[in-house]
Swiss-Prot record:
<dbReference type="GO" id="GO:0006270">
    <property type="term" value="P:DNA replication initiation"/>
</dbReference>
<feature type="region of interest" description="Domain III, AAA+ region">
    <location>
        <begin position="114"/>
        <end position="335"/>
    </location>
</feature>
<dbReference type="Pfam" id="PF00308">
    <property type="entry name" value="Bac_DnaA"/>
</dbReference>
<dbReference type="GO" id="GO:0005737">
    <property type="term" value="C:cytoplasm"/>
</dbReference>
<dbReference type="GO" id="GO:0005524">
    <property type="term" value="F:ATP binding"/>
</dbReference>
<keyword id="KW-0963">Cytoplasm</keyword>
<feature type="binding site">
    <location>
        <position position="158"/>
    </location>
    <ligand>
        <name>ATP</name>
    </ligand>
</feature>
<dbReference type="GO" id="GO:0016887">
    <property type="term" value="F:ATP hydrolysis activity"/>
</dbReference>
<dbReference type="InterPro" id="IPR013317">
    <property type="entry name" value="DnaA_dom"/>
</dbReference>
<dbReference type="Pfam" id="PF08299">
    <property type="entry name" value="Bac_DnaA_C"/>
</dbReference>
<keyword id="KW-0235">DNA replication</keyword>
<dbReference type="InterPro" id="IPR038454">
    <property type="entry name" value="DnaA_N_sf"/>
</dbReference>
<comment type="function">
    <text>Plays an essential role in the initiation and regulation of chromosomal replication. ATP-DnaA binds to the origin of replication (oriC) to initiate formation of the DNA replication initiation complex once per cell cycle. Binds the DnaA box (a 9 base pair repeat at the origin) and separates the double-stranded (ds)DNA. Forms a right-handed helical filament on oriC DNA; dsDNA binds to the exterior of the filament while single-stranded (ss)DNA is stabiized in the filament's interior.</text>
</comment>
<feature type="region of interest" description="Disordered">
    <location>
        <begin position="87"/>
        <end position="109"/>
    </location>
</feature>
<feature type="region of interest" description="Domain IV, binds dsDNA">
    <location>
        <begin position="336"/>
        <end position="455"/>
    </location>
</feature>
<keyword id="KW-0238">DNA-binding</keyword>
<dbReference type="GO" id="GO:0003688">
    <property type="term" value="F:DNA replication origin binding"/>
</dbReference>
Length: 455
């Protein structure tokens, strides 16, 4: 197989997998040889080879076969030496250009995700569900001595995690213009890591990330299951902590609940301050709507919003803040276009689809299924007679959630739990209420299940 043939195979793969996948996962491959139905490739890391094997092996085999070089399997090996032309190899991609000596990371290399100018502390509405997270973020933004490291913010979609991280970055840049503050998503961290591997600039990557004063990584759950990225993240984390540099992390769940995240990383993340942004309550939703409405009154001068509309929306739209703000944006835009006052009737007509989605009722059957999945028990045990602690406690959790999240009466809930008496349901509900005060794991379980059911 000639170099020209491999170039043609690569061109076919580009069309098949798309440019982003090609640049990230196919372009770095170096075909070292093809013999007895086995294509051998050199890859930057074992993780890289495993990923290509799982996601692109079929495409590569198909293109090689079409080019007249049928293969049965692919093999990947990591080379610790710089790439150079190998005369003995039957087919080889053009050699990569040699790695360049890299100076200290310049300021322009410290580019992360763009910060949203709207996401400041002034625009963040504080209420009971997020007051601790807000206070902790304010403390970090003051830029004083590092008191907790990392600050770990977690919660469901649209509860303010990203807003607070942007606000911290904005404040730090104002207070300390010379500080090296880097904010980016975990996906961007992985992409830049893979890019550094591909370009043989991993030392520059390490130097860049370990030279920052504040590292902020959003949605860290993204790196779960990605072994090489987790390895680099772990060492970057340790290096910054050793230098007493501030780290701020966010995720959609607590560190201990992130599946496939290495235990040593979970342990590190739990060493600092872990703060939950709880689902919004009525008062917080109303405050957010009032702030947003004040902003729109400036934009749409002369537009009138009737009494009770904001209260109605705060009661009805309980999913997350993004949906809530989006509903108000649509309402003001619609009223402006048609030249009408924003009344309750107009809101109901204009937002009918959002209101219908928000009206989705949680059923007892859904609760039983989610709780059974969470505790890894059979669904039939929810209504069965078994009294083992490993079954009885999840059953009581489901009873408690049925009482909290559905309008069903205790006798009706009892019937859905295998015909149990209403006093049994009441006992289960009270037992969970008592345990919540002392059992933090149970409280976390309930918070997670509630979010899953109301998502």
């Amino acid at each position: 197989m000639t170099n020209e043939t491999w170039v043609q195979v690569r061109e076919g793969l580009l069309k098949r997998v798309g440019r982003n996948n090609f640049v990230t996962w196919i372009e770095p491959l170096r075909l070292m040889g093809l013999d007895e139905g086995v294509a051998r490739f050199e890859v930057p890391t074992l993780f890289f080879g495993d990923w290509v094997q799982r996601n692109f092996a079929d495409h590569i085999r198909m293109r090689l076969t079409e080019a007249g070089s049928p293969v049965e399997r692919l093999e990947f090996a990591v080379s610790n030496t710089p790439r150079a032309p190998l005369k003995e190899v039957k087919a080889a991609a053009p050699a990569a250009s040699p790695a360049r000596a890299r100076p200290a990371p310049p300021e322009e290399d410290l580019r992360g995700a763009p910060l949203d100018a709207r996401f400041t502390f002034d625009s963040f509405v504080v209420g009971k569900p997020n007051e601790l997270a807000h206070a902790a973020a304010r403390r970090v933004a003051e830029g004083g001595p590092v008191t907790f490291n990392p600050l770990f913010l977690y919660g469901g979609v649209g509860l303010g995690k990203t807003h607070l991280m942007h606000a911290i970055a904005h404040d730090l840049q104002k207070r300390q213009p010379g500080a090296r503050v880097l904010y980016l998503s975990a996906e961007q961290f992985m992409y830049r890591f893979v890019q550094a591997l591909r370009e043989r600039e991993i030392l520059g990557f390490k130097e860049l990330f370990r030279s920052v004063d504040v590292l902020m990584v959003d949605d860290v759950q993204f790196i779960a299951g990605k072994d090489s990225t987790q390895e680099e993240f772990f060492h970057t984390f340790n290096a910054l902590v050793d230098q007493n540099k501030q780290i701020v992390i966010s995720a959609d769940r607590a560190p201990g609940e992130i599946k496939d995240l290495e235990e040593r990383i979970k342990s590190r993340l739990q060493c600092g301050l872990v703060v939950d942004l709880h689902p919004t309550d009525y008062e917080l939703r109303l405050g957010i709507l009032q702030q947003k409405a004040d902003f729109y009154r400036e934009q749409y001068r002369g537009l009138v919003i009737a009494d009770g509309v904001l209260e109605f929306l705060a009661h009805r739209i309980t999913t997350n803040v993004r949906v809530l703000e989006g509903a108000l944006t649509r309402l003001f835009a619609f009223a402006s276009l048609v030249g009408r006052e924003i009344t309750l009737d107009l809101a109901q007509d204009c937002l009918a689809d959002i209101l219908r989605a928000s009206d989705r009722k949680v059923t007892i059957e859904e609760i039983q299924r989610k709780v059974a999945e969470h505790y890894n028990i059979r669904l039939s045990d929810m209504i069965g007679p078994k009294r083992l602690r490993t079954i009885a406690r999840p059953r009581q959790v489901a009873m408690y959630l049925a009482k909290q999240l559905t309008p069903r009466s205790l006798p009706e809930i009892g019937r859905r739990f295998g015909g149990r008496d209403h006093t049994t349901i009441m006992h289960g509900v009270r037992k969970i209420e008592e345990l919540m005060a002392t059992d933090s794991q149970l409280a976390d379980d309930l918070q997670l299940l509630r979010r899953l059911l109301q998502a």
